[in-house]
Amino acid sequence: VLQNPEASTDASIRLAGQLNQQRELNPTQPAVRELCESVLLEGCERWIRHVIDQQPPQGRGPWVPGRYQLRLIDIWLNCQMEGDYNPMHTHGGSFSGVVFLKVPSQINGSSFDGQLCFHGPEEYHLQSFRTGMAKYVLPSPGDFYIFPAWQPHSVMPFRGSGERWSLAFNVVAQPTSGHPRPPEQNQNISLSSQRPGAKGL
């Protein structure tokens, strides 16, 4: 993909990033499929277990092994250069993630340049103190982050030469066909379904 970027679909038309280059990867390619199955989906599964296994059994809802399956929605490469940025946004699906591949030496924690930022709910209340409002992540090649798709996040621009490469993806959790939802108990009957609909004039 890096040697011939034009051969891969331009992903920028559907993404928020104002980046030099964003290219879709084909999930059916053997290397991408292996990465997805052995690293990305496995990472999402570990994230689910880390969170859900701390809950009592009655609080785990559908997140019981065997009741759901994870499926990759899309995966793409990001190339960020000097001045490029990714504004605050969210993703579709259930989980999103990023793998940092290449980071210029000047992105080193001495400033917020090139850092991934997770935004908290305080962001929407301008009068609140900014304590704990944002969590900055210094990118390092090989680091891998997974987060809920609804989590607002952004990427800061950086100064100087070099390229910041990352791999991003979205995953959806679906119920398995062998485990249908149990019937709900004590269902309420809607009164509106028991009377005739309104007639037009």
Q: PLM features: what roles do these ranges have?
A:
Residues 29, 33, 90, 160:
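Aromatic-acidic/polar surface patches that form glycan- and anion
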Residues 4-8, 12, 126-130, 200:
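Compositionally biased, intrinsically disordered low-complexity segments enriched in polar/Pro/Gly
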Residues 154-156, 189:
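Karyopherin-beta/Importin-beta family HEAT-repeat alpha-solenoid scaffold
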Residues 66, 70-146, 156, 163, ...:
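Catalytic core of non-heme Fe(II) oxygenases with the double-stranded beta-helix
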Residues 1-65, 83-85, 188:
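Non-heme Fe(II)/2-oxoglutarate
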Residues 170-201:
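Double-stranded beta-helix
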Residues 166:
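Acidic, two-metal ion nucleic-acid-processing modules in DNA metabolism proteins
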